[in-house]
């Protein structure tokens, strides 16, 4: 079977003439098939350039005709333009075209009008669906790769909510973004309406309902901690201005990862003040690491442990609070129904392990980022988003990085991880919890580091001087 593709500028007279000839051949020859593509004059040249680059062809006029040896989408063999197609029809089929110049021009204008009508119809149909626009920054990362299938599963936003995923990263990562896009489409998820790629900053976050900020790339070697901190400010300033300009009025912005999570959240709040209350930092990754360490010690599964609280700097100096932590389904002489729980600290008899080894191991994981890979980052972000949309489990404490308003004696104006619950599409700080007082020394240590990070990032402090004190449980 001879399968041809005819593509051209919608207002091109020669496309109109080639189209008439192709229609005649398809009608009269049983094994001749034609697929037609029109492009608006404003985008034709760029579309043709991309097509030729992809297929390694050399062609710069309208129309362009190629033959596909397989069904549409198979390997293409360039035939050429109108003249080459006419010559091919004469030699192989003994058919030519006698269309007049006047008729060519008239049909070309009709083609342009039809093309514009079809495009407007497509846009109106898209408007009827109105999917949730989800934007992911640093989208070439491993965390994004693991995040996409969770977002498209229907577990986060609900099985009835259609989403459009927008992958945003720099131009150098375009090949990896294309790979992520193709794999996402291969999932064939009923919740996924479309996947798009964005490498132009000015186009980022248009109509965004959800924005996920992942760890940014480090393109050059950074010699000092201060330089590393300062390097976050320009990107957060760019993101903040784009969010203010392009995002939906009630967009949810969630910051995840393993480096300067609180700092990036605070900077985004500064540069996108309209959305400050809707910007949060994910702490569930660190919370999960703490639960896993406890579970290994108690020889149970991590999901049996609830209400571990992470205070302070999610990716820096923090305080893992076990005073409210509970264990469910623990095998011992005492058993109860599924809702029966026991305090974690009552089952950990090795206080030396709790106060030393447990603390040091978690501090090392936080400081180095080890074992905080793409899978953990993706799961903690997705779970936090699910809670934000549908509420956290009743009675369960969730750790979250939010802007302090002075709760628990925390200094105002810093992003601090603290206990919250999610309900009715928002989060509420659990200020009524009892026995959650934090010693002045621990509070000073955590707050001091967060304040210094912000001052260094904004250029108001030259050197970062971490608070010298041991981490205590």
UniProtKB/Swiss-Prot annotation:
Protein name per its UniProtKB record: Putative malate dehydrogenase 1B
GO molecular function: L-malate dehydrogenase (NAD+) activity
Presence of the UniProt keyword Ion transport in the record: no
Keyword Nucleotide-binding in annotation: no
Record gene name: MDH1B
SUPFAM superfamilies: LDH C-terminal domain-like, NAD(P)-binding Rossmann-fold domains
EC number, as in UniProt: 1.1.1.-
Pfam short name (any one): Ldh_1_C
Source organism: Bos taurus
Family: Belongs to the LDH/MDH superfamily. MDH type 2 family.
Record key words, sorted: NAD, Oxidoreductase, Tricarboxylic acid cycle
GO biological process, one term: tricarboxylic acid cycle
Domain of life of the native organism: Eukaryota
């Amino acid at each position: 079977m001879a399968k041809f593709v005819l593509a051209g500028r919608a207002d091109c007279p020669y496309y109109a003439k080639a189209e008439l000839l192709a229609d005649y051949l398809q009608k009269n020859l049983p094994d001749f098939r034609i697929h037609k593509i029109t492009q608006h004059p404003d985008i034709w040249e760029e579309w043709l350039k991309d097509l030729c680059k992809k297929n390694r062809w050399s062609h710069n006029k309208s129309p362009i005709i190629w033959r596909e040896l397989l069904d549409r989408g198979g390997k293409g063999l360039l035939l050429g333009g109108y003249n080459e197609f006419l010559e091919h029809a004469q030699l192989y089929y003994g058919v030519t075209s006698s269309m007049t110049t006047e008729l060519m021009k008239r049909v070309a204008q009709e083609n342009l009008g039809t093309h514009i009508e079809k495009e407007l119809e497509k846009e109106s149909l898209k408007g009827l669906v109105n999917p949730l626009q989800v934007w992911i920054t640093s989208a070439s990362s491993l965390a994004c790769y693991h995040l996409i299938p969770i977002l498209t599963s229907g577990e986060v936003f609900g099985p009835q909510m259609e989403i459009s995923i927008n992958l945003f990263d720099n131009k150098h990562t375009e090949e990896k973004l294309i790979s992520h896009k193709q794999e996402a489409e291969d999932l064939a998820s009923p919740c996924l309406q479309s996947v798009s790629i964005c490498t132009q900053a000015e186009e980022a976050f248009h109509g965004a309902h959800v924005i996920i900020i992942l760890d940014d790339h480090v393109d050059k070697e950074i010699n000092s901690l201060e330089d590393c901190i300062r390097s976050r400010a320009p990107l957060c300033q760019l993101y903040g201005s784009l969010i203010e300009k392009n995002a939906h009025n009630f967009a949810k912005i969630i910051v995840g990862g393993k480096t300067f999570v609180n700092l990036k959240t605070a900077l985004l709040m500064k540069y996108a003040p309209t959305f400050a209350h809707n910007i949060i930092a994910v702490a569930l990754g660190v919370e999960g690491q703490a639960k896993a360490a406890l579970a290994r010690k108690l020889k149970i599964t991590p999901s049996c442990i609830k209400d571990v609280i992470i205070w302070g700097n999610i990716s820096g100096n923090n305080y893992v609070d076990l005073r409210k932590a509970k264990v469910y389904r623990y095998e011992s002489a005492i058993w109860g129904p599924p809702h029966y729980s026991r305090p974690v600290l009552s089952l950990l008899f090795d206080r030396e392990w709790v106060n030393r080894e447990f603390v040091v191991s978690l501090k090392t994981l936080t400081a180095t980022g080890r074992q905080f890979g793409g899978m953990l980052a993706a799961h903690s972000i997705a779970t936090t988003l699910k809670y934000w949309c549908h509420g956290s489990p009743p009675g369960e404490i969730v750790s979250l990085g939010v802007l302090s308003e002075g709760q628990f004696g925390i200094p105002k104006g810093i992003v601090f991880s603290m206990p919250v619950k999610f309900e009715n599409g928002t989060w509420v700080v659990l200020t009524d919890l009892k026995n959650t007082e934090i010693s002045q020394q621990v509070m000073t240590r955590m707050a001091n580091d967060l304040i210094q990070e912000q001052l260094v990032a904004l250029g108001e402090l030259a050197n970062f001087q971490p608070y010298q004190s041991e981490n205590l449980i």
